[in-house]
Amino acid sequence: MSESPVTNASTLPGEGQMQFGIFSVSDITTDPTTGHTPSEAERIRDIVTIAKHAEEVGLDVFAIGEHHNAPFFSSSPTTTLAYIGAQTEKLILSTATTLITTNDPVKIAEDYSMLQHLTNGRVDLVMGRGNTGPVYPWFGQDIRQGLPLAIENYALLRQLWDEDVVDWEGKFRGPLQGFTSTPRPLDGVSPFVWHGSIRTPEIAEQAAYYGDGFFANNIFWPKEHYQRLIQLYRQRFAHYGHGTPEQAIVGLGGQAFMAKNSQDAVTAFRPYFDNAPVYGHGPSMEDFTEMTPLTVGSPQQVIDRYAAMRDHYGDYQRQLFLMDHAGLPLKTVLEQLDLLGGEVVPVLRKELAKNRPAEVPDAPTHAARVKAVYGDGPTRQARPNAAGGNNLTVGGPYQDTPAAAPKAGSAFGAAATR
């Protein structure tokens, strides 16, 4: 295997610690207890309220998915996150999935760099292929090429962020000659990237190759399935020279529904579980909670369940919870966030910090990653030359020269798809 790029992760201690938050798949589902189906406008307003409340109760991260079909509303995550970013101060804004297969890498590079600037660096993203098959032809792609698309598009995205002037030719989009994506990443440091996977080992391999994070969705499958993916990612992260397996950057999804009394939680959530399409009308709620991380009960039960996650997966950096799905009304979701932020997360922070080895990196933040590149020195402030975008006959497009871009290898670089 050829040389891999330098790591995208920060291993500086004391900058990010462990992050807790929520993610939304943006479903619009009928409330089975009232028969009310929210309008798109209602759900969009509600998701902003939910994200703002997440910050108010002390959570670190809000993430939203990307879908281009009903019954989902989140077709433009960057628009939503920019609006939320303008109304929050500390909340890290992320995606549950950014579709690397059907979005143009040029647009991803520019949109998320812009979001970085608007939020002062409070942004990262989870790359994924999505789980809606028809989205491929809707955007002119072939689902049978899903994995090669993901590999080629991400290699181009990294090049667009790492290099001011890009010459590129691949299989799935037109060539680029002397192209510069704008704006350049904030402080000369691109957004941190997680690679999300439910079942694909090649995505874990890709995350490891680049030294990026690996986010295991962890909501619909047994722990043994994700243990295999995470173990593979950790081993390959070390293989590519980014650190030890324990220094790999891992995020987990999860689900919870709580009440002070556990039986009250079971009674209240059962109609939502039994009727929500997301659960597929398959196993009983009891069987599903046994097989997956879904925890329906008291806050202490949620604490106990998630404090044990590192026993299964090792020390990790980010824990997100799915809280606003299955038709739950806004009032209930906000009450769930009160319990999550007020009773669960403070205890989990302490429990998961206990006996955490010093070499285990904290969760990545923009500030930590900037410090890893520049130390205490000045950061890059990209100032264009007067060439008007002519990168072919005039020198570089900017007054300064960025550091040399990481060298792509043959496994997941552009050469892999030619």
Task: Give short role names for the model-derived ranges.
Residues 20, 54, 58, 66, ...:
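Conserved, mostly hydrophobic/aromatic
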Residues 20-24, 62-64, 93-96, 123-127, ...:
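Hydrophobic faces of well-ordered beta-strands that scaffold small-molecule active sites
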Residues 2-17, 33, 104-212, 224-227, ...:
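Internal, glycine-rich beta/alpha segment that forms the wall or movable "lid"
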Residues 29-45, 97-106, 188-199, 290-300:
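Active-site mouth loops of central-metabolism enzymes
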Residues 1-93, 190-191, 374, 390-418:
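N-terminal beta1-alpha1-beta2 module of alpha/beta enzyme domains
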